[in-house]
Amino acid sequence: MKQELIMDAVGNDLSRQTAEIMHRFNDVFQLHDPSALAELVAQDCVIENTVPAPDGARHAGKEACIDLWSAIATQPGTRFDLEETFVAGERATIRWRYFMADGNSIRGVNLMRVADELIVEAMGYVKG
């Protein structure tokens, strides 16, 4: 099931651009199709993952970020339910619930930053 709610706090061109990038990024996980990632991720992208606790693993560089997100997006039997995407300028916050193959779920948030129309930073946090 594909779902999405994007709220734009600023309403300027930069926010609209960021909202479009987040829409395409969210589709990767909603549709289990990572093919768009190469066009969305900057060479110097950095992800701070949700695991391991307490600080999460750091993934640096386009290839490392695409590899991580591709693995998450294509995990069999899983799904992301998007609760909200909030955009303000070059920044976005994505609230989500991730359902694992065994039916258990976890809620979390990604703090995203875009520069030059590419994702340059993603910091993931989960409840738990």
Describe the role of every protein-language-model region:
Residues 35, 47, 78-79:
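A general structural signal for well-ordered secondary-structure junctions
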Residues 2-14, 52, 66-128:
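A beta-strand edge to alpha-helix "cap/lid" segment located at domain peripheries
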Residues 14-19, 27, 58-60, 86-87, ...:
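Alpha-helical interaction segments
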Residues 1-43:
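Short, low-complexity N-terminal intrinsically disordered segments enriched in polar/charged residues
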Residues 46-58:
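A short gly/proline-enriched turn/hairpin at secondary-structure junctions
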Residues 62-64:
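Contiguous, function-dense segments enriched for cysteine-driven chemistry
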